[in-house]
């Protein structure tokens, strides 16, 4: 009885802890989209004519899990979901996370999200396009030389009032495979931003650091004076020609770089009177050739056959060699410039656009938009999350992404091992077939050559017969071995030594040998490697 009571208490505690954790996750979760249900009504497709791509509610390949699918190649796509209320990014930690899978790979296309700021009055989700202003853009992008996980903060300059895109420097690369990957951006109150790929930190940066973002959120305190000009007498030459240097008297600037080799002699047998090319004697004028329309017909040229055996034809000329007296154009040696003042640059003045920030002046997030152009289909978005706690994002990664990724990884590993085994088998078969082709040409196997050749050809057409062919060849060898061993021990039959019979026997043997040679199959051409 007491054990039942303890067990009941344990279940109640477990249920309470689970409920508390669930409540905590719900409290810290701003938005979570699993796409378990069709997205119609929650996500609004842009009606802009540029966005012809069709979004579909589809399963991830190999899973029962649904996502938002890019279904067509070479299209622009636009879709948006509004938050129930704008999220203030200035208060505490904010985590942006989502999964994306390139089921057909990714050669050229984007798969990033735009976290839209509140739009102007009159804006509707149906009008979403590339001009719809955002606060943050985050996610993978790959095309040509571009291969990065974007993190772009669009920040309002407090001096000019203009919005400026600040790009994360040296962002992580996009994983190059067809597996599900989860991308996470964590914004901390201390201005730190961390980028995670599959839960692993790939980049840490400070939003206010000029070393981490381009351009920097906080401008430089000083700038070059735009009105400052270089003085006319400012000399930037570190070296100058020596004004006291004199050209040596024996310096010949006109001497050529190369001269004829006077020691060279014409090779013996050189055919001076033979041209290198002659008319093709076998060429004939085409029957439809019209001299008036096509011009005078001339036979095509071929290499002079007489020159093939000779060291050369035509006029012989001495080869050229480097001129030992060549020195080129003389110039004065360089010396340090006594008037050198260094490279001029304008003086620095206080930057009139300088301002200071303790924290970025984030714009609230009012909606999530996907606005991409891609050459690939099969891009699947899933489990889009906005949370206020890193642990919540980690929980979602472990429960939604990790199980799928593990299954996909195991499948990929099995496919790679199978492909490796297939390549190994092909190499093995090539070695076997090359060896069997050589075996088939052995003279003492001439009686069996046709059978061996037939077996090899069948095996080449059906590589899975390789083992069977090897067994068959072994049987042939074994049979031949037995015949040689046991057949050689039989007593020779008595033959009367009669010259006519011997001659007749010899003659018939020669004829039989000739017939056998005639009947033997033609030597098989070596197999071409595939």
Swiss-Prot record:
InterPro entries: Calret/calnex (IPR001580), Calret/calnex_CS (IPR018124), Calreticulin/calnexin_P_dom_sf (IPR009033), ConA-like_dom_sf (IPR013320)
Cystine pairings recorded for this chain: 108-143, 307-313
Biased composition (Acidic residues): 250-281
Segments crossing the lipid bilayer: 467-487
Biased composition (Basic and acidic residues): 224-240, 495-520
Gene3D superfamilies to which the protein is assigned, alphabetical: 2.60.120.200, Calreticulin/calnexin, P domain
Biased composition (Basic residues): 521-530
Gene Ontology cellular-component terms listed: chloroplast; endoplasmic reticulum; endoplasmic reticulum membrane; mitochondrion; plant-type cell wall; plant-type vacuole; plasmodesma; vacuole
Membrane topology: Single-pass type I membrane protein
Topology, Cytoplasmic side: 488-530
Any one Pfam family match given in the protein's UniProt record, by short name: Calreticulin
Region described as P domain (Extended arm): spans on this chain: 223-356
GO biological process, one term: protein folding
Keyword NADP: no
Task performed by this protein: Calcium-binding protein that interacts with newly synthesized monoglucosylated glycoproteins in the endoplasmic reticulum. It may act in assisting protein assembly and/or in the retention within the ER of unassembled protein subunits. It seems to play a major role in the quality control apparatus of the ER by the retention of incorrectly folded proteins.
Record-stated family: Belongs to the calreticulin family.
Descriptive protein name: Calnexin homolog 1
Organism: Arabidopsis thaliana (Mouse-ear cress)
Organism placement in taxonomy: Eukaryota, Viridiplantae, Streptophyta, Embryophyta, Tracheophyta
Encoding gene per record: CNX1
